[in-house]
Regions:
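Phosphate-binding loop of NTP-binding sites
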Residues: 1-121, 125-138
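Adenine nucleotide phosphate-binding catalytic loops in nucleotide-utilizing enzymes
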Residues: 94-101, 136-224
Length: 224
C-alpha cells in the first residue's frame, strides 16, 4: 500500500494465483530485462517493494502478490494483472474458500480500468472469474492448457497457440526450466503479460529459451 501511494510512473504488472507466482514473476522479469527494459521485481518474491529503485516511465515493476498482500492493499492500480489459478489455500485466514477467492478477485477489481487481465481458466474458480471479467467489459486474455479456445492463448502438447485452429506461436518443448503442464501455464501467462507491456513475439520467444529458472524449481540434479 505504501508503494502504491507513491504513484509510480513506471508500469506495474501484478501476478497472483495459488501456484506458479514466483516462476511467472521471475520469467517476466527475465523477458523484460532481455528486451532491454529497466525492471524491478519482487514483493512476495525476493526484494521488498519498498527497497525497489525508482524507475522512470520506460521501466516496469513486476509484483508477485499473495492473498495476504492483496488484503492489505487498497490503492494499487496495475496496468497488467495475471491470475494464474485458484485452489484451496490459506482458508484459515480468509474464513473459507469464498473469502480466498474474494481476495484474489480484488486485485483485478483494483486494476486500472484499461488494464489487461491475463486470466487462467483451467479450474472452476478461475474460469468463473474469467467469465465475469469478460461480462464486465474488461480487457481479458484467457490462458488455457490442453484445450483449444477461440480468444486468448492456449498450450497443447507444448505448443503455444493464439487461437483455435491457428499455427503455433512458440514451441515450449525442450526448455529445461519450463518443463511440464504447470510451467506451460506460467510461460503462457508471462508471454501474454510481456505482449501487454509492448513486447513482440520476436523479443519474447528467445528469452523463454534462456530463462535460468528459480533455485529448487525443476532443476537438473544429475545426468547419465
Amino acid at each position: 500500500e505504501l508503494f502504491a501511494r507513491t504513484r509510480p510512473v513506471a508500469a506495474v504488472a501484478a501476478i497472483t494465483g495459488t501456484n506458479g507466482k514466483s516462476t511467472t514473476t521471475s520469467l517476466l522479469r527475465h523477458i523484460l530485462t532481455t528486451a532491454g527494459r529497466a525492471v524491478q521485481a519482487g514483493a512476495n518474491l525476493g526484494l521488498p517493494v519498498l527497497d525497489f529503485d525508482n524507475l522512470d516511465a520506460a521501466g516496469t515493476y513486476v509484483l508477485e502478490l499473495s492473498s495476504y498482500q492483496i488484503d492489505l492493499t487498497m490503492g494499487l492500480r496495475p496496468q497488467v494483472v495475471a491470475l494464474l489459478n485458484i485452489s484451496p489455500d490459506h482458508l484459515d485466514r480468509h474464513g473459507g474458500m469464498d473469502g480466498y477467492i474474494t481476495a484474489k478477485r480484488r486485485l483485478l477489481q483494483m486494476a486500472d480500468a484499461k488494464a489487461v487481465l491475463v486470466l487462467g481458466s483451467d479450474d472452476e474458480w478461475s474460469a468463473r472469474i474469467c467469465q465475469d471479467m469478460r461480462a464486465a467489459g474488461r480487457r481479458v486474455v484467457e490462458i488455457a492448457i490442453g484445450r483449444e479456445i477461440n480468444d486468448g492463448l492456449s498450450v497443447r502438447d507444448g505448443q503455444l497457440y493464439r487461437a483455435a485452429g491457428a499455427r503455433p506461436v512458440a514451441d515450449l518443448n525442450g526448455i529445461e526450466t519450463l518443463r511440464g503442464v504447470h510451467d506451460w501455464q506460467n510461460a503462457a501467462v508471462a508471454f501474454a503479460m510481456a505482449e501487454a507491456l509492448g513486447l513482440t513475439p520476436v523479443q519474447i520467444i528467445p528469452a523463454l529459451r534462456t530463462y535460468p529458472g528459480l533455485p529448487h524449481r525443476m532443476e537438473v540434479a544429475a545426468r547419465q
